[in-house]
């Protein structure tokens, strides 16, 4: 079955990134190849068949949701008309996930309800050697407000779609954490719809897993919307962590801010692939999106040899009647001047390096609204730095 518009998408002649072909039908997409723009950084051979249809579901992921007043959780089948309101898959893996899940989890915050405590959603993988597909939708009804923490644990091979539907004048802070076991492969497609005068704070954290790829599409569906997309990732030897974003400004007077920061450390003596991170940030300002204010930044800190960071910011502007638009990207090693300054004040080099990395990530951690998550990330970064110091000592000896 060939869906309308597929040929244009394959040939790359869509008028802009917001008009890419989208379908729930996996057969409407060709099998990805390394030469395809959206897959050129992804190690397809390490995806265990998620991209070509050979990964049949052999297990299931478990999703548990904490109980909170004014929050309702439902389990529904694929035919539920609410599914897909956040967005439609734009790649084969996301379509495969939609075609293959057994049941979807819907988490809804009622109209005009302010949820005081964070809503915890725990996703436990299918386990080593097993494959699973999933679907999650978080909806904040009009004038509602909530903080949601989506925490991934366990292991296995997993692909899913996650929808964030933020109705008019609603506010959602969504913290998405990938803290998988080392052998995990996880491909996750996020679809966010932001209503009139609504606010979305979308935070992604990547720590564990073998290959983790998160693609997020954010659409403004009314004037006055506000989106902040934050990301923190720390890649070790052998890990591939990839973030791909598209912010689609299609209505007037909306604003978006994107800030992603990552650190990488490898081991040149290891037989594993280099630590590899990828960040691709696309922002589209359509002709009718006058008054747009947007900026995106990606920073990467390379701590050792045996690590590589790819960073690709893109900005498409179809109108000059905007408040502002820009992007910045930088990848580098430790700032020698910073280290010299700290060491000149009697701080040992190892401690000085820790201080620099803490400061590097501190800007993002401080923006996370959940104290428990902030503490957890601080501890995780300290653990990663211990690995860095251990690797350097081994290399020197």
Swiss-Prot record:
Protein family according to the UniProt entry: Belongs to the iron-sulfur cluster assembly SufBD family.
This protein's name: Iron-sulfur cluster assembly SufBD family protein Mb1497
GO biological process: iron-sulfur cluster assembly
PANTHER family: PROTEIN ABCI7, CHLOROPLASTIC
